[in-house]
Amino acid sequence: MNKDQLLHMLDAFLSQSGLYHHEALPGDLLSLLRKSGIEAEFLKEFVKMQSQYDVLGRAQAEQLSQYERIDDRLYSLHIDKGRKFNIRILYAYHSVTGQRILLHAFWEHRSRDYESAIAVAYARLNDLEEDTL
């Protein structure tokens, strides 16, 4: 799958699903997936997990092992397929609207990878929340 196809599929899913996300998220995913050979598998898993979240609702979905609460505001969605990929998407809920916002995607290799990813996610969350004030 080439870059344009991947970006088109990501944009189509994010738009169609109504998932609120930081504008940099598709770029995060593109840089993680481009030329990896796992693009289609990842997208299938990502769509499946978002659909599952919608069906179960927040309370039940976040009880699943793929979801992890990082702190008071930030959560992690773990999308993996054995040794093929181990991608995390950090998200939060908007402080005013309560809407879930996908903030930042990264490839988790070590637990230290979270440190910089959390900083990026909070910067993006602050940007989005400042825009609504």
Where are the regions a protein language model picked out?
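Basic, Lys/Arg-enriched alpha-helical interface segments
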Residues: 1-86, 95-99, 107-133
